[in-house]
Amino acid sequence: VNDSLWLGLAITSPYGMRIRYGSDWAAHERGISGSVTTVDINPSIAWKVNDYVSLGGGVSALWTHSKIKSGIPEGVGDGQFEYKGSDWMFTYNLGLMVTPIEDLRFGVSYRSSAHVTTRGDYYIRGNNYMNGEGDGKGRLQTPETVYISATWKPIQRLRLSGLARWANWKKFENMRFSMDDSNNLQKTQFGQMVSIGSPGLAGMLQTGLSNISIQNDWKAAWLFSLGADLDITDQWTIRGGIALETDPIKHQQLRTALIPDTKRLWLTCGLSWKPTPKWQIDMAYGHIRGIGHRDLYQSDTSNVKVGKFEKMNAWMAGAAVTYRF
């Protein structure tokens, strides 16, 4: 807008995952398949108070689409549960940057938690007592995050940076799914016999099958990173970084097959091209390697191991286009 006020717009995907196993694998009660896709539209404003202090903030419209399939928890028979749903929700972010001297700056930023409630389709299949489908809801809460960063320019074309990120994964206590009308569940022949012989048990089974929760009970996690940017020319910049992220899983029995997290090592690289003073194109590649515990237990209260994830690796690639008005 002017030399001290900026408007911006970012479109990103802050969270996401996809995982799939065979429907008949031995630990299907711990998860069969899952995917979460997000798109975050974040208009923002920044104000340069003076040569030393800048403030910023924004509001995000976050679209989430999720698909979850899992074996039905113990106690309500066998079979599979599946949910597909999507919806919009809103969060906000705030930031502060301090530049005590020309070649050194510090930043602090905060992003709020999001209460995600999606609407979609709820399915129960292959159960001994009841099966059916209908409208349903999915609920979870994303973590609030705090970033603390520092950037130093020791020489003209080199910038060194460090970052610490705190993510309050305590908010990610569970994922809850419910069917709007449990009468959409139709009793099997065996279920009808149970209903005649024990109406109370049949009611408990209907409630259990129409309200399924996947327990996470995670803890807050930290990420620490170091990086460097080198300007090869006025148009080209290369960069690289390394980061270590702590394990958010409170105890190992809580690890599910759907989100098998652990301590992680990040390795990243990228480059920027400025064809004109107003346009910039950024490209990045990252590799995440799980380096912590990888055991999977029979349930979140069991000491029986049913397996171990041989590898927990991920690869990421991204690109961005920036235009400065």
Segments from the language model and where they lie:
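Outer-membrane beta-barrel porins/channels
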Residues: 1-325
